[in-house]
Every structure is written in structure tokens, then in C-alpha cells.
């Protein structure tokens, strides 16, 4: 997948700890947290929520709750005391959320979103369930691309890295020379993806977070999180809130 040919580069950041090393203020940043935050966010916009406010601190969630907001949040898989529900994608498909604003706070995903937002980049949210929409948008932007894996408590995450690899493959191959990569982490993610894509659900059995979810009886979402193109929703960060890019046209 290593390629020096192409107008724009694509890189992969495997961990929030490495994020400060990827200073590219003009790049499009794709934040992903497959199990489960980014999948839940994409599902929410498929369900036509109005917006999502990502926050990093529990105190922020508590303050929004006191103001009457719907709050979704978890730490280590356990719902926050102030939360109406956690971060299962199925929670966000509740028809009652249509047209509503939800405040979201998670162990990994919203932390990465906040970090990306502070760098001043254009930020979108990616998951397998909106992979084609993400890649199509990226190809339209005429920018370098950086896939930011939320990981697990600053550690490498297999599922996020697989999504990164799928994105690298689509942008380098499908764009027919528009993108190139000389980034080792992008090449490694693409190689991991090439090994796994024939049986993604089977391959993910090796992932540590898959087993964390199983121990907490939260693995009912596994297959959904690995479903391709369930939605064409494209969450974008605008003035501190996530909105569906389709509604901005």
C-alpha cells in the first residue's frame, strides 16, 4: 500500500498519545472509535438527531444535565450517573431522539474528538457503518487526510486500526492516484486490513476490546459496529457540535 504517487497524503495516528506528533492544520481529520462511540454517533445522525455535543469531563455532562439536556455517557463501559443512557449505537436509534440534541461523553471517543477540535482541523466522524460516505467526502475535499484512532485509554486498538486500514485502502486505491502514503502506520493499518477483511467478524475475536465488551455483556453491538455502509450520514464538527453534513447543503 506504500505509494509516493498522489496529490494528497493519508496518515494514521494510532493513539491519542501520538496526536501531538501529527500537526497538520490543513488536513481533514477522521476520528474513529468503532467500539462504540463513532458508530453510535453515526447511528444517531442516521436517526436524524439534531446535533451531538461531545464533552470530555464528567463535570461537563453533569452541568448539561442540570440544564435539561439529554446526556449519553460512560466510563469503562458503565453508564455515568448523570446519563440517560450509555454509548451503545442501539440507544441512539431510539425514534424519540429524532430532532434532539444529545450531550455525549465517553472513555475514548469524545476525548479524541476534543483533542482533534483543539488543533483547528476540519473534523469528521468515521465508522464502518458510514465508510463510503467518509471516503467520498475525503476525496471531495482536496486535502491531506489523517485518521485519528481513539484507541483504548491511549493504547493501540485493533478495531480502530482496521477501520483506518480500510480507509487507507479506499483512498489510495479507489481514488486512482489522488492520495498517496509514505506513513508507516498507514501502511501497517492497510496491511492489517488486508489480512482481516475477508472475515472481519472472525478476525475481531482477537481484539482485546471485543473481550472487554463481552465481559460486561455489551457485545450485542459487535456485528452492527462491523457492518458496512448502514448509513450515508456524515457527522462533522461545527462550532463545538457534531451535525450531519447532509443537512448543511
Located regions from the model:
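Active/ligand-binding-proximal structured segments within catalytic/core domains
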Residues: 28-40
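Long, charged alpha-helical interface segments
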Residues: 84-122, 136, 141, 158-249
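Phosphate/ribose-phosphate-bearing ligand recognition and processing surfaces
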Residues: 150-160
Amino acid at each position: 500500500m506504500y505509494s509516493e504517487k498522489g496529490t494528497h497524503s493519508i496518515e494514521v495516528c494510532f493513539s491519542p498519545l501520538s496526536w501531538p506528533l501529527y500537526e497538520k492544520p490543513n488536513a481533514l481529520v477522521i476520528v474513529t472509535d468503532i467500539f462504540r462511540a463513532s458508530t453510535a454517533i453515526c447511528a444517531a445522525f442516521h436517526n436524524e438527531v439534531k446535533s451531538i455535543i461531545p464533552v470530555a469531563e464528567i463535570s461537563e455532562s453533569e452541568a448539561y444535565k442540570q440544564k435539561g439536556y439529554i446526556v449519553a455517557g460512560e466510563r469503562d463501559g458503565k453508564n455515568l450517573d448523570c446519563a440517560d443512557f450509555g454509548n451503545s449505537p442501539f440507544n441512539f436509534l431510539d425514534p424519540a431522539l429524532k430532532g434532539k440534541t444529545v450531550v455525549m461523553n465517553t472513555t475514548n471517543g469524545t476525548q479524541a474528538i476534543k483533542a482533534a477540535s483543539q488543533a483547528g482541523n476540519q473534523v469528521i466522524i468515521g465508522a464502518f457503518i458510514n465508510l463510503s460516505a467518509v471516503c467520498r467526502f475525503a476525496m471531495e475535499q482536496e486535502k491531506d487526510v489523517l485518521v485519528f484512532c481513539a484507541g483504548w485509554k491511549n493504547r493501540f486498538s485493533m478495531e480502530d486500526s482496521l477501520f483506518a486500514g480500510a480507509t487507507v485502502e479506499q483512498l489510495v486505491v479507489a481514488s486512482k492516484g489522488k492520495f498517496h502514503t509514505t506513513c508507516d502506520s498507514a501502511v501497517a493499518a492497510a496491511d492489517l486490513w488486508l489480512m482481516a477483511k475477508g472475515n472481519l467478524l472472525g478476525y475481531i475475536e482477537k481484539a482485546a476490546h471485543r473481550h472487554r465488551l463481552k465481559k460486561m455483556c455489551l457485545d450485542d453491538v459487535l456485528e452492527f459496529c462491523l457492518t458496512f455502509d448502514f448509513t450515508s450520514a456524515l457527522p462533522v464538527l461545527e462550532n463545538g457540535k457534531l451535525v450531519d453534513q447532509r443537512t448543511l447543503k
